Amino acid sequence: MRCKTLTAAAAVLLMLTAGCSTLERVVYRPDINQGNYLTANDVSKIRVGMTQQQVAYALGTPLMSDPFGTNTWFYVFRQQPGHEGVTQQTLTLTFNSSGVLTNIDNKPALSGN
């Protein structure tokens, strides 16, 4: 009888604590990287006054371009390391009607480490 009681108590205790895992970081979670991966060195290659072709050669194809034809390119990189928070890097490039780069907006700014 004592063995049955001990087994039942252990089973109940196991069920009650099953959702309270303190070993969350033991479970493998892969890093999820999406978009255009750019380093600070890549961003430093572009300058106001470059053409769209020069920018595309330096950085590659943008993830998105403005669908309304205002000549805006978006390079977005989103990273979610396994057990950490999500970070997002957005580089927005604006061109004039001649296809010349007029504005660079880098949020949050990449810093060379």
From Swiss-Prot:
Disulfide-bond pairs as recorded: none
GO CC term (a single one): membrane
GO molecular function: identical protein binding; protein-macromolecule adaptor activity
Signal peptide (UniProt feature, chain positions): 1-19
Keywords of this entry: Cell outer membrane, Lipoprotein, Membrane, Palmitate, Signal
Domain of life: Bacteria
Membrane topology of the entry: Lipid-anchor
Disruption-associated phenotype: Mutants show minor defects in the assembly of outer membrane proteins.
Subcellular location: Cell outer membrane
Entry annotated with the keyword Cytoplasm: no
Lipidation feature positions (N-palmitoyl cysteine): C20
Any single GO BP term: response to antibiotic
Entry keyword Signal: yes
Quaternary structure (record): Part of the Bam complex, which is composed of the outer membrane protein BamA, and four lipoproteins BamB, BamC, BamD and BamE. Forms a subcomplex with BamC and BamD. Monomer in the periplasm, but is able to adopt a dimeric conformation in the cytoplasm. The Bam complex has the shape of a hat, with the BamA beta-barrel crown in the outer membrane and the periplasmic brim formed by the BamA POTRA domains and the 4 lipoproteins. The intact Bam complex can have 2 BamE subunits.
Family, per entry: Belongs to the BamE family.
Protein name (record): Outer membrane protein assembly factor BamE
Protein's organism: Escherichia coli (strain K12)
